[in-house]
């Protein structure tokens, strides 16, 4: 089987599927990269196609694996990360309320622990946005990059709302006095603007892993 026949059978199998064109583009990119690497190693076209079949499977195998991916997966990916980020804010709000209204030693200990770890928490939070990009590309390939950007922009909504609420003093800043220094607030605001960039970094890492 030559390359043209191989690709043609895949195109025929994926024709009409949601995101079918993006799938085909992604597959062709991997095929080209694999063949180029085989030719660099001095293999003939026949040998290169043999290694391609061993690595990727037959066109039927590829079509079957891609048909298992349901469009709802895209929505599930977006909703999962929107839920995760919103849940983090909900937990933060709950801890703040308990800190203000309860005289619990446990709550005070948690608050103190957060107070001395804000920079570490921020670093871990930035890594989370990188992981969104990484996971998106690992799960969906090249077609996942737009999904990652869309997911990040929507998931950022709680962050932007909180930033505006804090800047306009809707919530008294005194409640967070032990947590939020001016320097830390500025860093958080700047980091929020960079969330899409962190996502792109994750996409880049994911693409490198796919190769």
Swiss-Prot record:
UniProt entry keywords in alphabetical sequence: Cell membrane, Membrane, Transmembrane, Transmembrane helix
The UniProt record lists the keyword Transmembrane helix: yes
One term under GO cellular component: plasma membrane
Membrane topology: Multi-pass membrane protein
Domain of life assignment: Bacteria
Residue stretches spanning the membrane: 77-97, 113-133, 152-172, 179-199
Main location: membrane
Keyword set includes Transmembrane helix: yes
Subcellular location: Cell membrane
Name the UniProt record assigns to this protein: Uncharacterized protein YwdD
Upper taxonomic lineage: Bacteria, Bacillati, Bacillota, Bacilli, Bacillales
Gene field: ywdD
